[in-house]
């Protein structure tokens, strides 16, 4: 076991803060309408240009192991916020940096770290309640468009595309983002279905960077039993291999030998295949598999219908123009099922909804109906160069996630104003002692950081702007895009409540843990052994 280096107390926290600052300073330049781009070096191909905070954070690895620990912990803030809300990663990073900087000053001054953390936690809970109280529903197309526009770095075209997509497939409908072939952004709506099951092995992923599987024109096998014997699949695999097309297997499960064989064949290029678990449970699972079979033109292979897997042939397989699989979801686009059969299936589900006794059953049936009839909206991003395409696609992805978050939990005034207005909820809030009170004061000050950074990135004087915003009430705030003050909602500058809430909660959580850190342990790098001295040239004695 390699020897370890241990840092304690102020020395440990100082190293950790250096790492946090390095990462946060690189991320926070992207915040706001006048935020700057960051260029990321890639081991192959052209560098990536991005304004996406979490993309910047993910690229950062520091040489000093203790500084790197600090950077990686704050990277977790950005990643968690992106996972939960899909946006707000830069805001979360800025909040975490502000909290940690002030918190470590307080610890150095002799305050109790645990009491500081309790004060921060208490203030966070109160601020979350206030944000929910300030929130307004986001249901009309105009609000949806405004949220999409702001999250796409004030790109009105993107906001309109997202609003149009939601209008066509519904707010709960499936919307995907692809790289387009032209210079202009496009919106296509194609019949499709998404369910919440991903690939059974990451080795099925065709795109190692995004860990996704993209199958063009695949065959689709739908089975309602566990597959553990590969011999049952051999006739299908041989037929698919000869055709040169891909195969998607949807089954209750694929186990042991069968899964291992599929993975090996996929990695060797013998047959391009991906296996996913069937969605749902019990009778609902069988019904959903029948829905997918109807959509893709496949025969549902079930022993209940006197069909055995080993007797299945190519005629029983369905097809679709494209299938996208992630670790969590599978999306089937443009299934080859007959329109009459799909319409008949939809009518059966509608009849079941009318007869459903419980709200739960009705809700699940409506989900199936939406998946079968709603279709998939595809936003095709257009750009002149590949670098611009990647940067724009990241922005559209962010905007889509932010819009979904807004529909889910509502909207608040954007531009950091909601956090400033939430400060009043901390008036009169006290802890059990002075150190807890200081923790509350820390958070009160830290939540001004996003607005200060937006102003700073726009070239303004942050203290002047913050004081001006504080002196007013309601949605009054600062529009950094054109250097004006006014009602943020009327100007269309909105933030999803879920994004602001998630950023605050994750930043406070991580900052609290880091403030209470007293020791750091890292491995000591062993010195590389010296290179042996080279021998003499051929036919000559060795050098002395």
Curated annotation (Swiss-Prot):
EC top class named in words: isomerase
PROSITE patterns according to UniProt: CHAPERONINS_CPN60
GO BP: any one term: protein refolding
Residues involved in ATP binding: 30-33, 51, 87-91, 415, 479-481, 495
GO molecular-function term, one example from the UniProt record: isomerase activity
Cross-referenced InterPro entries: Chaperonin_Cpn60_CS, Cpn60/GroEL, Cpn60/GroEL/TCP-1, GroEL-like_apical_dom_sf, GROEL-like_equatorial_sf, TCP-1-like_intermed_sf
Compartment(s) where it occurs, according to its Swiss-Prot or TrEMBL record: Cytoplasm
EC number in record: 5.6.1.7
Reaction(s) this enzyme catalyzes, per UniProt: ATP + H2O + a folded polypeptide = ADP + phosphate + an unfolded polypeptide
PANTHER family the UniProt entry points to: 60 KDA HEAT SHOCK PROTEIN, MITOCHONDRIAL (PTHR45633)
Record text on subunit structure and interactions: Forms a cylinder of 14 subunits composed of two heptameric rings stacked back-to-back. Interacts with the co-chaperonin GroES.
Protein family (similarity comment): Belongs to the chaperonin (HSP60) family.
Protein name, as recorded: Chaperonin GroEL
Organism listed in the record: Francisella tularensis subsp. tularensis (strain WY96-3418)
Originating gene: groEL
